[in-house]
Amino acid sequence: MVSVLVVGYKAFDLGIFGDKDQRLKIIKAAIRRDLIYLLENGMKWLVFTGNLGFEVWVLEVAKELQEEYNFQLATIFIFENQGENWNEANQEKLANFKNVDFIKYAYPSYENPSQFRTYNQFLLESTDGAYLFYDEENETKLKYLYRMMKENKQYHIKKLTFDDLNEMAENFSEI
């Protein structure tokens, strides 16, 4: 996978309401492990959609890894006004998504529901695969994008699972 779409749970989906949550250490350790694997297997681009939660944590780890690895970061927002109503702390996270190698907006603003499907299709057509933190047993609106990913047999999916995190937590004292 040369270009990898990053999508996953939002922080509130996981009950994480602050940057000091201890679970983030384990999540970020797992992200670091997975990104190194992807980088060592040819990844050149990480593509974000600008959502809070998993994408923020991947972006933070990726920016650290850019000191050691040569790869690019892109954010393709669905709307130009995405995040304009976020609080100050989240505005900083939005600014980080805009401080990448490539930024694009799919639409100026929301007009109709079909924009979401078209946007998801564009993301899948523009990337080779995805780095995904999602579990079908804990559904969110990500289920639609995940379903589209699975329908394309050529689309590669690298998943971070709750089992991965549990295993990482068991070994965390060694990290």
Swiss-Prot record:
Record-linked InterPro entries: YspA (IPR010697)
In terms of Pfam families, this protein maps to: YpsA
For this chain, the family text in UniProt reads: Belongs to the UPF0398 family.
Q: Which PANTHER family match?
A: UPF0398 PROTEIN SPR0331, UPF0398 PROTEIN YPSA
Report the protein name in the record.
Answer: UPF0398 protein SGO_0588
